[in-house]
Amino acid sequence: MDRIVEIEKVSFENDFEVSLRPSKFEDYIGQEKIKQNLDVFIKAAKKRNECLDHVLFYGPPGLGKTTLAHIIANEMGVSIKMTAAPMIEKSGDLAAILTNLQEGDVLFIDEIHRLSPAIEEVLYPAMEDFRLDIIIGSGPAAQTIKIDLPKFTLIGATTRAGMISAPLRDRFGMDFRLQFYTSSELSRIVQIASAKLGKECDKNASLEIAKRSRATPRIALRLLKRIRDFAEVNDEQIISHERAKEGLNALGVNSLGFDEMDIRYLEILMQARRRPMGLSTIAAALSEDEGTVEDVIEPYLLANGFIERTAKGRIASAKCFETFNVKIDIEKGLFE
């Protein structure tokens, strides 16, 4: 099922998103603490004429990990090479990428938690000593050839930091968890994006879109593009608050940013009446894979207190029952 609030796991953006990407920290909205720290570390590295230490970004999808990687490369004055872990199937694939880097380049690996152990073994000496250890042959006759690499900065991005092996994580000089955005931050992002689309957006309209965007910029931009369609069909140059609400309601995104899938998820938990449910059970009931449930649906619900994770599974919170005006002990149904 396609969702207007869905976020693709592989975060290589389309042309529209690329056109909106800021190139400097001062133009990047949100993630203030991360920006401040990175700005210091980059200035220090440039002052010493060194590469920036390897960086790990983690957190829910759509929060700006790829954008920050591009800003780092731009601020360092170097090129960025991009790939994703699923594309690196053999050690030779990684070796080809590493040997084609130039001095100081940034290598961005998305979904880095999906690297195989064999690939990680090749990556360790590259990260620590900027060296490739190539094993030729097998058994007692095997030989190791060492190839020097140019110094580079690896930036890893993941939605599942817990799946990154400890040895790999330890080799990053810094790691940052990206936080959800405030409605005010998202409203500013929507205003900037709408101007680039050649469409003025009323302040209340941009705030309405922001409030229904699950605190995620990528979703806010996706909703904005669809609301623009509603305005254009009605020959309106300005996106009004009423038009924004009409469009969002038509898209099935409610005032909390929930769509049909979120409601189904919460219904399943509320029907359990505070009995914990396992991830596999929930995923089966939704006809979704466990990764999508855990990485895409749950983070926003958890962050806003609608669900709780216990040692035995997931439960709907008291806030969830109150929001939907559901009593835990009712027998006839959920939404009466």
Curated annotation (Swiss-Prot):
<keyword id="KW-0238">DNA-binding</keyword>
<comment type="function">
    <text>The RuvA-RuvB-RuvC complex processes Holliday junction (HJ) DNA during genetic recombination and DNA repair, while the RuvA-RuvB complex plays an important role in the rescue of blocked DNA replication forks via replication fork reversal (RFR). RuvA specifically binds to HJ cruciform DNA, conferring on it an open structure. The RuvB hexamer acts as an ATP-dependent pump, pulling dsDNA into and through the RuvAB complex. RuvB forms 2 homohexamers on either side of HJ DNA bound by 1 or 2 RuvA tetramers; 4 subunits per hexamer contact DNA at a time.</text>
</comment>
<feature type="region of interest" description="Head domain (RuvB-H)">
    <location>
        <begin position="255"/>
        <end position="336"/>
    </location>
</feature>
<dbReference type="GO" id="GO:0006310">
    <property type="term" value="P:DNA recombination"/>
</dbReference>
<dbReference type="Pfam" id="PF05496">
    <property type="entry name" value="RuvB_N"/>
</dbReference>
<feature type="binding site">
    <location>
        <position position="21"/>
    </location>
    <ligand>
        <name>ATP</name>
    </ligand>
</feature>
<dbReference type="GO" id="GO:0000400">
    <property type="term" value="F:four-way junction DNA binding"/>
</dbReference>
<feature type="binding site">
    <location>
        <position position="66"/>
    </location>
    <ligand>
        <name>ATP</name>
    </ligand>
</feature>
<feature type="region of interest" description="Large ATPase domain (RuvB-L)">
    <location>
        <begin position="1"/>
        <end position="181"/>
    </location>
</feature>
<feature type="binding site">
    <location>
        <position position="181"/>
    </location>
    <ligand>
        <name>ATP</name>
    </ligand>
</feature>
<feature type="binding site">
    <location>
        <begin position="128"/>
        <end position="130"/>
    </location>
    <ligand>
        <name>ATP</name>
    </ligand>
</feature>
<keyword id="KW-0234">DNA repair</keyword>
<comment type="similarity">
    <text>Belongs to the RuvB family.</text>
</comment>
<keyword id="KW-0067">ATP-binding</keyword>
<feature type="binding site">
    <location>
        <position position="171"/>
    </location>
    <ligand>
        <name>ATP</name>
    </ligand>
</feature>
<dbReference type="GO" id="GO:0005524">
    <property type="term" value="F:ATP binding"/>
</dbReference>
<dbReference type="GO" id="GO:0005737">
    <property type="term" value="C:cytoplasm"/>
</dbReference>
<dbReference type="InterPro" id="IPR041445">
    <property type="entry name" value="AAA_lid_4"/>
</dbReference>
<keyword id="KW-0378">Hydrolase</keyword>
<dbReference type="InterPro" id="IPR008823">
    <property type="entry name" value="RuvB_C"/>
</dbReference>
<feature type="binding site">
    <location>
        <position position="65"/>
    </location>
    <ligand>
        <name>ATP</name>
    </ligand>
</feature>
<dbReference type="Pfam" id="PF05491">
    <property type="entry name" value="RuvB_C"/>
</dbReference>
<comment type="subunit">
    <text>Homohexamer. Forms an RuvA(8)-RuvB(12)-Holliday junction (HJ) complex. HJ DNA is sandwiched between 2 RuvA tetramers; dsDNA enters through RuvA and exits via RuvB. An RuvB hexamer assembles on each DNA strand where it exits the tetramer. Each RuvB hexamer is contacted by two RuvA subunits (via domain III) on 2 adjacent RuvB subunits; this complex drives branch migration. In the full resolvosome a probable DNA-RuvA(4)-RuvB(12)-RuvC(2) complex forms which resolves the HJ.</text>
</comment>
<dbReference type="GO" id="GO:0006281">
    <property type="term" value="P:DNA repair"/>
</dbReference>
<feature type="region of interest" description="Small ATPAse domain (RuvB-S)">
    <location>
        <begin position="182"/>
        <end position="252"/>
    </location>
</feature>
<dbReference type="GO" id="GO:0009378">
    <property type="term" value="F:four-way junction helicase activity"/>
</dbReference>
<keyword id="KW-0233">DNA recombination</keyword>
<feature type="binding site">
    <location>
        <position position="62"/>
    </location>
    <ligand>
        <name>ATP</name>
    </ligand>
</feature>
<dbReference type="InterPro" id="IPR027417">
    <property type="entry name" value="P-loop_NTPase"/>
</dbReference>
<keyword id="KW-0963">Cytoplasm</keyword>
<feature type="binding site">
    <location>
        <position position="67"/>
    </location>
    <ligand>
        <name>ATP</name>
    </ligand>
</feature>
<dbReference type="GO" id="GO:0016887">
    <property type="term" value="F:ATP hydrolysis activity"/>
</dbReference>
<protein>
    <recommendedName>
        <fullName>Holliday junction branch migration complex subunit RuvB</fullName>
        <ecNumber>3.6.4.-</ecNumber>
    </recommendedName>
</protein>
<keyword id="KW-0547">Nucleotide-binding</keyword>
<feature type="binding site">
    <location>
        <position position="309"/>
    </location>
    <ligand>
        <name>DNA</name>
    </ligand>
</feature>
<dbReference type="InterPro" id="IPR004605">
    <property type="entry name" value="DNA_helicase_Holl-junc_RuvB"/>
</dbReference>
<dbReference type="InterPro" id="IPR008824">
    <property type="entry name" value="RuvB-like_N"/>
</dbReference>
<dbReference type="InterPro" id="IPR036390">
    <property type="entry name" value="WH_DNA-bd_sf"/>
</dbReference>
<dbReference type="InterPro" id="IPR003593">
    <property type="entry name" value="AAA+_ATPase"/>
</dbReference>
<feature type="binding site">
    <location>
        <position position="314"/>
    </location>
    <ligand>
        <name>DNA</name>
    </ligand>
</feature>
<dbReference type="InterPro" id="IPR036388">
    <property type="entry name" value="WH-like_DNA-bd_sf"/>
</dbReference>
<feature type="binding site">
    <location>
        <position position="66"/>
    </location>
    <ligand>
        <name>Mg(2+)</name>
    </ligand>
</feature>
